[in-house]
Amino acid sequence: MFGFFKKDKAVEVEVPTQVPAHIGIIMDGNGRWAKKRMQPRVFGHKAGMEALQAVTKAANKLGVKVITVYAFSTENWTRPDQEVKFIMNLPVEFYDNYVPELHANNVKIQMIGETDRLPKQTFEALTKAEELTKNNTGLILNFALNYGGRAEITQALKLISQDVLDAKINPGDITEELIDNYLFTQHLPKDLRDPDLIIRTSGELRLSNFLPWQGAYSELYFTDTLWPDFDEAALQEAILAYNRRHRRFGGV
């Protein structure tokens, strides 16, 4: 399942032979990273944005097709107002300082979540990024903003119920495939909607309402590395761990 590259006859270096097509990332640990440096939490969020740029470029180079990043959850509104305001301004800075390079590297930017609740400047920055990169054919960087997995499924069920009432579909038409077409990830190619691998940084061992439908059969990788310290080498290690596993999808 994985190969070896001989670096100098004496040393064998394991390299991945299978790259996950879709990687989900729960970018956790920005606040703790800042605290360790006696800096405010927002300092960590800024460093986390720089890490995202580096990891996206590395993933694109490795041949990953989609990265979905958990940028802001529906529960994160309970954080201090100043921190929320800072986070909501990061997409503006991201568009100004990072999107041009990603665009030059053929990266396509998209967003999922209840985006109608986002502040105007946040929504406009991401919409501009989507418009600028819409014809790119490389890696898709999928921002989950104001996203919650349960809310996503609830909204899908409401839409399906309305379509049943409007006689657009029959109850017997409701299948897993149909539900999949009502989720936020419906804009992705069908074979790329479900993450092959979900990474969570910072040592926390939970998924926190991230892609519960799409991640049903995802391989999970937890690392103690705080998100701002997660780099290309850390990404490669996660992919190596993925390579060592046998995905059964309920079989043997």
Regions found by a protein language model. Give the residues of each.
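Flexible, compositionally biased loop and terminal segments
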Residues: 1-252
